[in-house]
């Protein structure tokens, strides 16, 4: 059906992106949720309070997913490689669900329904919402939309385009494990070390590509490309994450808001440096962040196809 592997991959990536835009994540039976349950079951066997045990745990899961992806990509049939690439890309993306949740939190905060916004926030990030009021919920949601623009939108597309089904499924496995065990809590400080470091590596290039796209797309929401570059260069290194800081700083500068500060998780309170030098984010800024995130995903889809064509034999 298609003349070469690169055409197959390009078409599959675009179809997968379209599936995410149209359908989003299913409420039941999502492959990432199934993987998460399997990882939790395996943890009951592999858990030891040490880095080696954590590395074994991550290696088994990511290796299994990568082998599954390689097998799917090599099944016979002219249409199957496109279907496999499209399905894997769709499973790894989460842009539509991210935007939907961001808009729902915006709606709740505009109605001053803080309790409902608190209940919804954990579906977006791992923050402890119990002590957060409207401004804190707004900042937490905006920071999560920014960070997940890379994790759930741009980076999966780049891995799918550059290396195919095994890579994009392996990336989603790594990112899911980081969200499950990559914390500095007493239980996971050592066991989750490998997941956290591998996630840093897997997102390094993609996070910076995301920041570049934020700079380019900022005018769509009335944002400042110059402000995005300034905050990125000045503030990103202050963030405890080498990747989230890049994207969050770019969003802060583009939207002329100030992010960072006290950040409470269930296991600890982090006092983070500020990113950007604008105003405290308002609900309208959260809405702008959601729109910017979606535009960045569209830009990433174009970039992914360009990457496939550039790598063709």
Swiss-Prot record:
InterPro entries hit by this protein: Cobalamin_biosynth_CobD/CbiB
Protein name: Cobalamin biosynthesis protein CobD
Any Pfam family hit: CobD_Cbib
UniProt key word Cell membrane: yes
Gene Ontology terms describing biological process: cobalamin biosynthetic process
Pathway recorded for this protein: Cofactor biosynthesis; adenosylcobalamin biosynthesis
GO CC terms of this entry: extracellular region; plasma membrane
Organism: Mycobacterium tuberculosis (strain ATCC 25618 / H37Rv)
Gene giving rise to this polypeptide: cobD
């Amino acid at each position: 059906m298609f003349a070469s592997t690169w055409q197959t991959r390009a078409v599959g990536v675009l179809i997968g992106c379209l599936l995410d835009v149209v359908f989003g994540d299913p409420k039941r039976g999502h492959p990432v949720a199934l993987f998460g349950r399997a990882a939790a079951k395996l943890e009951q066997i592999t858990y030891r309070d040490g880095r080696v045990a954590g590395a074994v745990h991550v290696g088994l899961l990511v290796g299994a997913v990568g082998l599954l992806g390689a097998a799917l990509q090599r099944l016979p049939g002219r249409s199957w490689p496109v279907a496999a690439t499209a399905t894997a890309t769709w499973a790894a993306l989460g842009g539509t669900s991210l935007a939907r949740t961001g808009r729902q939190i915006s709606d709740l905060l505009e109605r001053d329904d803080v309790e409902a916004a608190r209940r919804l926030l954990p579906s977006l990030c791992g923050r402890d919402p119990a002590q957060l009021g409207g401004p804190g919920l707004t900042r937490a949601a905006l920071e999560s939309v920014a960070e997940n623009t890379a994790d759930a939108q741009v980076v999966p597309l780049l891995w799918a385009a550059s290396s195919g089904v095994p890579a994009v499924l392996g990336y989603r496995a790594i990112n899911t494990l980081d969200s499950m065990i990559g914390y500095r809590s007493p239980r996971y400080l050592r066991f989750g070390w490998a997941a956290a470091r591998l996630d840093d590596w897997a997102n390094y290039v993609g996070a910076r590509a995301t920041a570049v796209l934020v700079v380019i797309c900022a005018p769509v929401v009335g944002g400042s490309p110059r402000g995005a570059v300034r905050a990125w260069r000045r503030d990103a290194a202050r963030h405890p994450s080498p990747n989230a800081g890049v994207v969050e700083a770019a969003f802060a500068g583009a939207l002329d808001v100030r992010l960072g500060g006290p950040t409470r998780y269930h296991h600890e309170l982090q006092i983070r440096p500020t990113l950007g030098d604008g105003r405290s984010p308002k609900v309208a800024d959260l809405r702008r962040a959601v729109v910017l995130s979606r535009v960045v995903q569209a830009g990433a889809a174009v970039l992914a196809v360009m990457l496939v064509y550039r790598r063709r034999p």
